[in-house]
């Protein structure tokens, strides 16, 4: 991801070093200034970092320091993508504090990251930003990054939602029931393995830039049940007998207590077209409404017509799209 990166108008001398845990407050502040509508917290960021499987995948973060007082003024990350894994493919992220932009700091961080990745034999780079970030988009394009994919962000006013208008969509087909992950964990603590298998199967059908790859169960499990964002009572699962056939889950935000985020909604191929996805989404909306949440936010590929259709029908309002950018390093100068 790239956040508010601009080309320099004056040079600034900064020190670049490896990230240390005491840098969390500074990088969270920088990230929240870059994307204030999607703020994170130190706890959330630390959880993401600590649950990333560094035995299987490469992960590294740098910070840029103002040399006179060691203030963190920028950051850069790179890592393998566990759910779209290729040993030569990496996600990259850059952000510079607003007061320190246009001084060449982003360029210094970029050069450091690309140099590292070239030494690791990287050939593909991936990063993301919102279409409103015109400076970041221009910055990426000037460095050879091209647009690969677009995803709508959409938002639903949960409190204004008229559940009565969807009464006919609440009912389930014969033989299908909906339970929560909390209920399933109480019934069988080992249920996560079956849920993971379904999640991986459903992910194969989601439009994406790079082919889906199966990441570690352990990472997925931590995200589902131990993340600061986890809500097992808002993780809805459709069952046909004892078999899982669909899901739709919500996650919370520590900074935005009245906002919930849709994680993933999907139904197995042989059960599609029967209203199960809509019924799952309605349970999620009902949860948000009954818990006093103001808004639900979600993201969908612009190519995912079926899910976009459901969201439009429910009343989700499209926001500016998020763009995936990529760069091929195969012919990049390695000198």
Report the location of each language-model feature.
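Acyl-donor-binding surface of acyltransferase catalytic domains
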Residues: 1-12, 82, 98-105, 110-187, ...
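Short amphipathic alpha-helix that is part of the acyltransferase structural core
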Residues: 2-50, 57, 63-66, 71, ...
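Conserved donor-binding loop and adjoining core beta-sheet/short helix segment
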Residues: 21-24, 28-132, 240-268
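Alpha-helical elements of Rossmann-like donor-binding domains used by nucleotide-donor carbohydrate transfer enzymes
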Residues: 26-30, 108, 112, 194, ...
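Conserved acetyl-CoA-binding loop-helix of GNAT-fold acetyltransferases
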Residues: 102-115, 142, 267, 273-286, ...
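Active-site/acyl-donor-binding loops of N-acyltransferases
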Residues: 143-162, 234-236, 286-335
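A mid-sequence, solvent-exposed acidic-amphipathic segment
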Residues: 209-210, 217-237, 241-242, 247
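Extended hydrophobic/aromatic segments used for targeting, binding, or gating
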Residues: 245-267, 271-297
């Amino acid at each position: 991801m790239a956040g508010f990166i601009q080309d320099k108008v004056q040079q600034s001398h900064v020190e670049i070093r490896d990230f240390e845990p005491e840098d969390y407050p500074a990088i969270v502040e920088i990230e929240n200034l870059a994307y204030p509508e999607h703020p994170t917290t130190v706890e959330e960021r630390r959880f993401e970092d600590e649950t990333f499987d560094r035995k299987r995948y490469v992960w590294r973060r740098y910070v840029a320091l103002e040399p006179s007082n060691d203030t963190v003024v920028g950051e850069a990350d790179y890592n393998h993508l566990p759910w779209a894994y290729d040993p030569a493919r990496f996600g990259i992220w850059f952000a510079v504090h607003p007061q320190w932009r246009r001084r060449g700091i982003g360029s210094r961080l970029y050069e450091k990251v690309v140099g590292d990745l070239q030494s690791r034999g990287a050939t593909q780079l991936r990063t993301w930003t919102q279409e409103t970030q015109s400076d970041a988009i221009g910055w990426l394009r000037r460095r050879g990054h091209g647009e690969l994919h677009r995803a709508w962000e959409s938002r639903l006013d949960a409190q204004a939602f008229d559940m009565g208008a969807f009464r006919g969509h609440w009912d389930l087909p014969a033989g299908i029931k909906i339970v929560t992950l909390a209920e399933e964990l109480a019934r069988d603590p080992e249920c996560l393995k079956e849920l993971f298998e379904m999640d991986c199967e459903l992910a194969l059908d989601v439009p994406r830039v790079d082919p889906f790859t199966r990441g570690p169960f352990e990472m997925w499990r931590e995200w589902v049940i131990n993340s600061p964002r986890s809500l097992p009572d808002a993780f809805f699962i459709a069952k046909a007998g004892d078999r899982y056939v669909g899901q739709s889950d919500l996650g919370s935000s520590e900074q935005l207590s009245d906002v919930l985020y849709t994680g993933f909604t999907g139904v197995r191929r042989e059960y599609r077209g029967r209203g199960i996805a809509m019924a799952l989404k309605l349970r999620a909306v009902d949860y948000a409404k009954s818990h006093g949440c103001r808004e639900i936010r979600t993201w969908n590929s612009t190519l995912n017509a079926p899910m976009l259709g459901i969201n439009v029908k429910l009343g989700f309002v499209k926001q500016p799209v998020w763009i995936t950018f990529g760069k091929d390093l195969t012919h990049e100068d390695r000198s």
